[in-house]
Design a protein with these regions (language model features):
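Conserved small-domain helix->loop->beta segment predominantly found in fold-type I
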Residues: 58, 67-93, 97-147
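Conserved PLP-enzyme active-site core in the AAT-like
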Residues: 1-67, 144-148
Length: 150
């Protein structure tokens, strides 16, 4: 499961509850860490127990078993220091606050979608009145009328 943006799920469900075998939680989109400016976004990768033997290992603490891919990076600790930002964000909000943040993400996305819908085509909502935490605008008309290109 792509957990790059968990804004519509945090506090309400989880990748495990949805029966995902693997989920990468990219922290910059959901838990307030900066993206870029020192490296790519990062975050934990959660797996179900049956996949643990296939996980990569750390070069200084573990020896690869026969099914592991071994070490996949030369960065000893990755961007571990950035995890303190997400930890503080979650700790300060608490369980109720994290859930409320999810509700606001969904509310804000739907508010903006409704405000922009008269002016832009919205992709992937055919027959639906609401979106989850995001929506995709078709900017083809704007690009043609202004000459702005990618």
């Amino acid at each position: 499961m792509d957990g790059a943006n968990m804004n519509a799920q945090v506090g309400y469900t989880s990748p495990g509850y949805l029966n995902a075998d693997v989920c990468h939680l990219n922290l910059h989109k959901t838990f307030s860490i900066p993206h870029g400016g020192g490296g790519p976004g990062m975050g934990p990768i959660g797996v179900k127990k049956h996949l643990i033997p296939y996980l990569p290992t750390h070069p200084y603490t573990e020896k690869p078993n026969s099914t592991s891919l071994g070490t996949l990076t030369h960065s000893e600790f990755g961007s571990a220091s950035i995890l303190s930002i997400s930890y503080a964000y979650i700790a300060l909000l608490g369980k109720a606050g994290v859930r409320k943040s999810t509700a606001y993400a969904i509310l804000n996305a739907n508010y903006l979608m409704k405000r922009l819908q008269p002016y832009f085509k919205i992709f992937c909502i055919e027959g639906k009145e609401r979106c989850s935490h995001e929506f995709i605008l078709d900017l083809t008309g704007l690009k043609k009328s202004t000459g702005v290109s990618e």
